[in-house]
């Protein structure tokens, strides 16, 4: 049985309701799977441009720094040796690509598992819109969110063409905004509450339902 959540207007009053399909918002939350997907996502975000110079790359002459015997010091062959100050680094980091290949089905399952966890905790909300008129208003968004989601970290999910809402929320430190097609397990997990606009939630449900129907047809074909 699908769960329903209230849709509130700009004044924070109930303006309707919308159903959250069990196939999207009440699936198993596989913690090891989510951990693997999020770890891969964070790894892919690394630049991987770290680099140190080995003894063949640091500057310095190739001559022997002092004679082999008679100084009382340990013998040295080069000022570029790793034990010398300013010498090369042994086994230092080199540029590399940290990205991992994660199957699309795993990424999708991790997202739905994270959303289902938030839905079961009554942490998913819906609003009609964040702005009214043709001008962005951060003040209006803050007032609306104060009555909808009072947690420290809030994820706002919008439609891609909702520029007024993006401009209204981008200056709020505790709010992170995404479009519904950018939703991912990591951003859901680091947010205490997820607030959709009604249009964004309907778009997300429609997109996922269409994708599931297409896959079913391919299997039956």
UniProtKB/Swiss-Prot annotation:
One of its GO terms (molecular function) is structural constituent of ribosome. GO terms for biological process: translation. Residues 45-100 are annotated as: Disordered. InterPro entries: Ribosomal_uL4, Ribosomal_uL4-like, Ribosomal_uL4_dom_sf. SUPFAM superfamilies: Ribosomal protein L4. GO terms for cellular component: ribonucleoprotein complex; ribosome. Keywords: Ribonucleoprotein, Ribosomal protein, RNA-binding, rRNA-binding. Part of the 50S ribosomal subunit. Belongs to the universal ribosomal protein uL4 family. HAMAP family: Ribosomal_uL4_B (MF_01328_B). One of the primary rRNA binding proteins, this protein initially binds near the 5'-end of the 23S rRNA. It is important during the early stages of 50S assembly. It makes multiple contacts with different domains of the 23S rRNA in the assembled 50S subunit and ribosome. Forms part of the polypeptide exit tunnel. This is Large ribosomal subunit protein uL4. The gene is rplD.
